[in-house]
Design a protein with these regions (language model features):
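A detector for short, charged/polar N-terminal pre-domain segments
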Residues: 1-8
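Intrinsically disordered, low-complexity terminal regulatory regions
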Residues: 8-84
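Short, solvent-exposed cationic patches
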Residues: 41-42, 102-116, 163-172
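Structured interaction and signal-relay segments at domain junctions
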Residues: 63-122
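Short hydrophobic/glycine-rich mini-motifs in sensory/regulatory modules
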Residues: 135-145
Length: 173
């Protein structure tokens, strides 16, 4: 049943509520994904939850530091959107492209050059080279760190790997 304020659903005997497929699709909710449940006055609020987004200030600091040290554009993502972007703050909260999400699902690191660089979101300016490191904790994918520069060098990989270890350490706790 649909009302002017939303949908009406029954709670089953186990306390479950079905979220319609259209809503799951538009919010990019996948099977097994976490949602945050909060209570208001006479309301129950479901909110998409991202462990990476919950570490926003740490992600901002990591992206800022990496960008300054490497002189490159740095993005930190969760599995559906950009969480931190130092050089272009307007890129934050942009949805990731399906192609980029599919690549992340492989849980592989990559260095892409030229035309092989993946667009993370619609309208993104591609760098000449791109380093992608997935954020994986206990086998679960939580996001990625992406560095775009004119040339990816060993120092880019090592510094980004260090930032990755810091974020993974926080996500494990």
């Amino acid at each position: 049943m649909k009302t002017t304020t939303g949908l009406i659903r029954r709670i089953d005997e186990l306390g479950r509520v079905v979220i319609p497929k259209e809503i799951r699709r538009s919010m990019r909710l996948k099977d097994g994904e976490e949602v945050e449940i909060s209570l208001g006055s006479e309301e129950l609020i479901l909110k998409k939850y991202s462990r990476v987004s919950s570490l926003k200030s740490l992600c901002d600091n990591c992206a800022n530091s990496l960008s300054k040290v490497l002189g490159a554009e740095v993005f930190i993502t969760d599995t559906s959107k950009v969480v931190s972007s130092f050089k272009n703050i307007e890129n934050e909260n942009k949805n990731l492209t399906h192609r980029f999400i599919e690549f992340l699902q492989k849980r592989e690191r990559a260095i892409n050059k030229g035309e092989d660089c993946l667009s993370m979101f619609i309208g993104q300016e591609k760098g000449k080279e791109q380093l992608i490191l997935p954020l994986v904790v206990n086998g679960d994918l939580y996001g990625s760190i992406v560095v775009q520069a004119d040339e990816i060098k060993t120092q880019h990989e090592k510094a980004t790997q260090t930032a990755l270890y810091i974020l993974v350490g926080q996500l494990e706790n």
